[in-house]
Amino acid sequence: MADKEAAFDDAVEERVINEEYKIWKKNTPFLYDLVMTHALEWPSLTAQWLPDVTRPDGKDFSIHRLVLGTHTSDEQNHLVIASVQLPNDDAQFDASHYDSEKGEFGGFGSVSGKIEIEIKINHEGEVNRARYMPQNPCIIATKTPSCDVLVFDYTKHPSKPDPSGECNPDLRLRGHQKEGYGLSWNPNLSGNLLSASDDHTICLWDISAVPKEGKVVDAKTIFTGHTAVVEDVSWHLLHESLFGSVADDQKLMIWDTRSNNTSKPSHSVDAHTAEVNCLSFNPYSEFILATGSADKTVALWDLRNLKLKLHSFESHKDEIFQVQWSPHNETILASSGTDRRLNVWDLSKIGEEQSPEDAEDGPPELLFIHGGHTAKISDFSWNPNEPWVICSVSEDNIMQVWQMAENIYNDEDTEGSVDPEGQGS
């Protein structure tokens, strides 16, 4: 009987998701300056824009690249580099250009050739997360279903993977007992990599000190302060010795690598009422960071007074698995997760007065809800070269590259204002 009820609930949920998607699709011309939807061969659990951009002469687009991965059923997995053509400002976006056979938005021009897989490198199991090293973006670290963290220099691998399926990382980083997701390169110390694991620990490696012969590198330091699965870890963006970690013990911990105590953080705070899944330091303000949680909220923190939560962002209907500050705007951050939504928030709007109708759509700081995904969003990334462009990937193989309409974030233009869910006012 329970099975029948579950099947009925699933069918109802699927119908609701499809209806919501139809409404979203109909409203895309009002909501977005760009939408590209691409069905990947396999779902990617990870997404990160590479920092380079190519602007070909005489063309109305620029070429950007993404680090992706695969999560296959039982087939060979790959670390993937893809290229994406983004239109220049003067190229016209035509939201009506929807290819129903491919299930893709062209976004602009014709559909073909906008998103291409450039490099595939054999990987051991699915790619839980992949992140490039800021000082040398050819070097990419990955989290695997085993306990090892792998490091690849993609310039040393052929663009087509070896058919044998053999995974040949340039380095293999040892120290964890279990898999995990959190991964962070130090932006100020080349080669310093942090990793968070289900084994309750955080490992630190320094790959710049590796002898040329050795492929296996042991962790330089293992931090053991958390009492449950460590979900995410992140270096501070300005202080080379500071990093933060969050875990299923509901805590946010701030660590200093100069301290000799690897089992006790500098600060520990009960951050949420459920597991804490992600954190992000603000790139413009050295004291501000955000955490996202299974309690469906994003919390805002000030390192100078962690006893006091600055703000709680509330609109998500389920667990939050990713939070990222905008690289271009100090007050903008985005969050995503199980509810299939990516929310963009604006701190500067906290506390603004709202009409009762507006309040129904969400708090004033909720700038935009991206409703284009019909499955859990696994990861997303702000484009470092094109403001307001985001790539998001979901569990149903879909990758979307999108940019909200300028009138939503530019307050000067009050004409044709659009509420965040896309029902135009």
Swiss-Prot record:
- State the name under which the record lists this protein: Histone-binding protein RBBP4-B
- What species is this protein from? Xenopus laevis (African clawed frog)
> Is-annotated flag, keyword Coiled coil?
no
Gene that this sequence comes from:
rbbp4-b
From the UniProt record, list the WD repeat ranges.
32-125, 126-175, 176-223, 225-270, 271-314, 315-371, 372-404
Swiss-Prot/TrEMBL GO biological process terms:
chromatin remodeling; DNA replication; DNA replication-dependent chromatin assembly; regulation of DNA-templated transcription
| Molecular function terms from GO | histone binding
What family does the database annotate?
A: Belongs to the WD repeat RBAP46/RBAP48/MSI1 family.
Quaternary organization: Binds directly to histone H4, probably via helix 1 of the histone fold, a region that is not accessible when histone H4 is in chromatin. Probably forms a large corepressor complex that contains ncor1, sin3a, hdac1-A and/or hdac1-B, hdac2, rbbp4-A and/or rbbp4-B and possibly rbbp7.
What the protein does comes down to: Core histone-binding subunit that may target chromatin assembly factors, chromatin remodeling factors and histone deacetylases to their histone substrates in a manner that is regulated by nucleosomal DNA. Component of several complexes which regulate chromatin metabolism.
